């Protein structure tokens, strides 16, 4: 009436259980390995993103002063170039001005260009190489003058942006290679004073 299990049947059941157990252990080990690998990748990605975000905040320029030259000191009507004295922001890594972009936004439209543009001139004031291909602000004490030649300025080259009239406003955004931006609002005086070659903006 009743089936009798002999030692052979019990042995087969034991082997089957062992195989299932080993399979479960292998699956768990593989899953753990995948989780560890994924966690490592996410941590690396998070660190890289964090460093990039830090660079975008800290590796930026400070604008120390802004001035402009008038078209004719005897009868001034327009600003035909803009001069910015630049430095690195506190805590910033070195900034290569040749890899920095400028964006002009105002009544004359919008223009974006690199500071290596032929209508931009970079002059060393302190701590910056005079070589055109090595305009790097390294120390916080370094200073460089960036001159933007506007349309109508004397000479062969300009950045393609119109000269500024009295009372005109202009927004200039400088963005470093790290992606950090500095915005400067420029306001041209409502009246020019005769015999002044430049004005503070």
Curated annotation (Swiss-Prot):
Propeptide, chain numbering: 1-11
Localization per record: Archaeal flagellum
GO MF assignments: structural molecule activity
A biological process from GO: archaeal or bacterial-type flagellum-dependent cell motility
Lineage: Archaea, Methanobacteriati, Methanobacteriota, Stenosarchaea group, Halobacteria
The protein's name in its UniProt record: Flagellin B1
Name of a matching Pfam family: Arch_flagellin
InterPro entries documented for this protein: Flagellin/pilin_N_arc, Flagellin_arc
UniProt keyword terms in alphabetical order: Archaeal flagellum
Keyword Hydrolase (UniProt): no
GO CC terms in record: archaeal-type flagellum
Function per UniProt: Flagellin is the subunit protein which polymerizes to form the filaments of archaeal flagella.
Similarity comment: Belongs to the archaeal flagellin family.
Domain of life: Archaea
